[in-house]
Design a protein with these regions (language model features):
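Membrane-proximal intracellular helices of multi-pass ion channels
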Residues: 1-456
Length: 456
């Protein structure tokens, strides 16, 4: 009877659209995580944590953002930190990828339904080879996170001893690879995030490597693995690599130029340390959320540059957020094609479909609108500058996690807005809209005449 009940309970999910199922399961994971973080055992004080704070933390972890209301290292006990780390790993890889691990362990066959959800979650256009892709993702993730944890373990070992060094290595490796930005080092008086290690090349370059690898995307991994020569890679992979390289080194150059003599950021460092800190800032803005200096000390122009880099984010099908590198690339290519009076958008001797151009434009406009509205709300509700409110809003919507220091003082309404933004940012506005608002695609029976409108 009990088995029959659960079978009936799961029947609606078997006929549900993959996009809608992904949204609902992510919501369930967040609520479950919030419930666990509310438990007295989750906090160092042994007292229950308020539900809104727990919900904010669980959403930030599952959506791999990194914004926090309470310090992760000092507020949460080991149980709470383990819950946060599990939420980061599930959110970074996707619940279906994690579920496949159990399918493999139990030697169960992955059916068509599961393949459909996996394809939607990973941004794949094909169901064939999806199981093989998941296997490669799990193996690659374990190898990269393991290597990062090992390097950080040996770096932390002389400073913290075996137990803490092992935990710090594992936690920060997973957090960096998943582009989450959570850290548990604050109980060692580091001054917040990775500020203590601003001049440490081992920590800086290890974290940067993990962030970049996690932000490239699983599809790019596979393409690079099978085609070591750049010319043989797909147009998408080449576009991702080119845009990522330009943004990282271009952003680093801009930050170095703007902040070179700023005493609150790079001013007190040696020239080589300034370049490393500028490079780290450019990388971490790609939705990672670690910081090696106070973000509130950035100049106004630097904050504007940071806003743009946060908006762009990482690549599709990765652990990163933002509107994605290729989305911005397609919009810029479309603008260039229009300026040259071309009727189609072309790149590397290939033509980009008009629907892809329309989707990219729509997504970018939606993110800009939501960022502006959210910033206005935070500025009015919490009496903070519009500049800092915009920084916080973009950081939440693009799942970055960097803050100018206003997160812990936000009112309940602003916290809820950021929770919604983090949720939208991780799952994607398109995924949520298609999953819940779009009707089933039907053949258009009526074709209307075109009309001319003036633009520009």
């Amino acid at each position: 009877m009990l088995l029959s009940f659960f079978q009936r309970l799961g029947r609606p999910f078997r006929t549900m659209r993959p996009g809608r199922l992904i949204v609902l399961v992510f919501l369930f994971i967040i609520l479950l995580g919030a419930g666990l973080l509310c438990l007295p055992a989750a906090s160092r004080s042994g007292e229950p944590t308020p539900f809104l704070t727990s919900l904010f933390t669980a959403t930030s972890a599952t959506c791999v953002t990194g914004l926090i209301r309470v310090d992760t290292g000092t507020h949460w006990a080991m149980f709470g930190q383990v819950v946060i780390l599990l939420l980061i790993q599930i959110g970074g890889l996707g619940f279906m990828t994690i579920a496949c691990l159990f399918f493999f362990a139990l030697r169960r066959k992955i059916g068509l339904r599961e393949r459909m959800v996996l394809a939607q979650a990973l941004g794949s256009d094909s169901y064939s080879g999806i199981v093989s892709l998941v296997r490669n993702i799990l193996r690659g993730t374990a190898a990269v996170e393991g290597a990062g944890a090992l390097i950080l373990f040996f770096r932390f070992l002389p400073e913290f001893g075996f137990g803490k060094a092992l935990w710090y290595g594992v936690f920060h490796s997973i957090s960096a690879f998943c582009n989450a930005g959570f850290d548990v080092l604050a109980d060692t008086d580091v001054g917040g995030s990775l500020c203590r290690y601003a001049t440490d090349p081992v920590v800086n370059f290890t974290i940067m490597a993990l962030i970049i690898i996690g932000g490239l995307g699983f599809a790019v991994w596979g393409d690079i693995r099978h085609n070591l020569r750049f010319s043989r890679m797909s147009v998408y992979t080449r576009l991702v690599i080119l845009i990522t390289t330009v943004l990282i080194f271009g952003g680093a150059g801009i930050f170095a130029a703007l902040e070179w003599n700023n005493p609150g950021t790079l001013g007190g460092l040696t020239p080589s340390q300034k370049l490393m800190a500028a490079l780290f800032q450019s990388v971490t803005l790609r939705t990672a959320g670690f910081a090696t200096f106070d973000q509130n000390a950035l100049s106004d122009v630097s904050k504007a540059v940071a806003d743009f880099l946060m908006l762009v984010g990482g690549s599709s099908g990765s652990t990163a957020g933002g509107v994605k590198t290729v989305t911005v690339g397609v919009i810029l290519l479309a603008a260039w094609s229009t300026a040259r009076s071309r009727t189609s958008v072309q790149i590397m001797k290939r033509r980009i479909p008009q629907q892809a151009v329309a989707n990219a434009s729509a997504l970018f406009i939606l993110v800009l609108l939501l960022s502006g509205l959210g910033a206005a709300f935070l500025s009015i509700a919490d009496h903070v500058s519009l500049e800092n409110a915009l920084y916080e809003t973009i950081s939440a919507l693009c799942t970055v996690g960097l803050t100018t220091g206003i997160t812990s003082s936000l009112c309940a309404a602003s916290q809820i807005v950021l929770i919604i933004f983090m949720f939208f940012g991780r799952l994607g506005i398109m995924t949520i809209s298609v999953g819940f608002m779009a009707a089933d695609r039907a053949e258009e029976r009526v074709s209307y005449a075109e009309t001319k409108i003036m633009i520009g």
